[in-house]
Amino acid sequence: MSVREDIKIMGASALMFRKGKYVTEKDLDIIIDIFTKMKFYSSGIDKEKLSKGESFSISFTNDHWRRRWDDDDYQWDSLDDNDHIIIYFYPNVEINYGEYIPSMGETVPDFLYFEDISGRGRLLLEFLHRYFKLFPEDVFMEEYFYTKDDIDKLYAKLPWNELWAYEDPKTF
């Protein structure tokens, strides 16, 4: 088993970066709207924390996940990971927690954290394709950095590779 396969089994997180601009409540609303248009429902939104500049998590689920969860014969391993995801939104980012982003030429803090992206390749690819149409300068990172161009190339290449987030975008 390769290291990448181990991560797929164990779980991995991913980050989103933005250069030079602080994220706002409007940015969060746009992110929620993207998931909503993908037929996901959000829970855990705490606008009071946002107004205080505190970070918080939001859980997104779709109808299929909800139906399985509410089923009397519910089995945890029967759920498709592409049916749910948790993100953490950081409205007041600090540069000392940043990453050097080559395409941006500087160290930039992350403002969005995707918890356990393992098995969520389709969900993330669809989300990022829509997201980068609105924020083309941002950068997504798991192990490698992905720009809008990288995601566009990957999105156009069918069938989608479920493990794309663990591969060097130069190989697309």
Q: Could you say what each language-model-derived stretch is?
A:
Residues 103-133:
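A mid-sequence interfacial segment
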Residues 23-27, 50-52, 146-150:
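General structural signal for secondary-structure boundaries
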Residues 20-23, 64, 93, 120:
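Residues that cap or initiate secondary-structure elements
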Residues 16-22, 113-118:
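Short beta-strand-to-loop capping motifs
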Residues 2-18, 37, 41, 122-172:
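Acidic, proline/glycine-rich low-complexity IDRs
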Residues 37-114:
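Short, intrinsically disordered low-complexity segments
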Residues 21-32, 122-124:
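Short, conserved charged micro-motifs
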